[in-house]
């Protein structure tokens, strides 16, 4: 036992000798610590064997021989003392090692985070998703649930809507765990030997277009969603899954998860450290953007706005109202801070990102518990001051400070009124002001944004 009490002092002397200004010092400390712990383990093991062989409670001179129960209790008590001493030594080793690492300026490794960017179409999610795609230690996936939507058919509303949400959730859970093989059941044509040339928007993920996932390209193999900056062969899903596990963090962007409550099993999964960022945008701006991007689906809206003769179909308005209500209910759930969402939910307005992209990106990284690299800041500066002609409907390059209010000059006031009537509860929750006239709608000096706390973290 004298050896045990003297050991920490000896260990501090060893550490003092090893206190060099180099990152290798920490490694040496761990090695020394492991050696000491192993020796202590052997020492405890030998003492334990002796304790089991002979009783440790000695009889007094006027007593009879100690009973087997007394002997066993004495052995157990001594073992407990040794176990306590060993635990104290291990704790001291950990504390001194962490202290030395701090003095050397070496940050402790970040725990693995799983970031889910949850949005709806035309809310700027592709742009915001790039904040995480540009981070080298994040494995980023762009809309992988697109394949499920194309393969599994669900009618809107009722039990079918719940069924689709459950399928999306279960696939999402496996993807966050780097089980990319689950997509093979939904990709068309089906992958052969885990190879596919049909993964949706592969080129929107740096992780799928860099070595070793990017394999040599093959002649006569057409890949619709090819990598942007280099030629790669068909995606090897096995290599992609391995790359996902090697990366320190995982991030995924989707517009196909509508109800926040369905994500509770993921938030409570001990294998995941989930962070949910819900991105919202003014529904009037969303409608204008969708009428351009999905022109065929909004013919009735455009015809009514231009001619105004035939009434707008009620089911179209109900669909709009349902979308706004779904977004609002999810946000209200997140802001109520149920136990399973505490510290895991962040509400962000696209307009605030557009006005201050770097500041909002850093806030999102802080919320996720990830340290951004300089490449993220460089990308944001380079891609938020893009020239006007670079703004395609799917572009992630934007002159963001000028773009976020452009919709105000391309929507007829009567169309804005329809949106305001259908989405007023959601607009008030998110801080979007209602326009009372066409003049107010197009007056740039009048802001349609409430300036309260634009970003809310729970």
Curated annotation (Swiss-Prot):
Its main location: Golgi. It holds the Pfam family Sulfotransfer_1. N-glycosylated. GO terms for biological process: carbohydrate metabolic process; chondroitin sulfate proteoglycan biosynthetic process; N-acetylglucosamine metabolic process. InterPro entries: Carbohydrate_sulfotransferase, Gal/GlcNAc/GalNAc_ST, P-loop_NTPase, Sulfotransferase_dom. It is found in: Golgi apparatus membrane. Sulfotransferase that utilizes 3'-phospho-5'-adenylyl sulfate (PAPS) as sulfonate donor to catalyze the transfer of sulfate to position 6 of the N-acetylgalactosamine (GalNAc) residue of chondroitin. Chondroitin sulfate constitutes the predominant proteoglycan present in cartilage and is distributed on the surfaces of many cells and extracellular matrices. Catalyzes with a lower efficiency the sulfation of Gal residues of keratan sulfate, another glycosaminoglycan. Can also catalyze the sulfation of the Gal residues in sialyl N-acetyllactosamine (sialyl LacNAc) oligosaccharides. This is Carbohydrate sulfotransferase 3. It comes from Gallus gallus (Chicken).
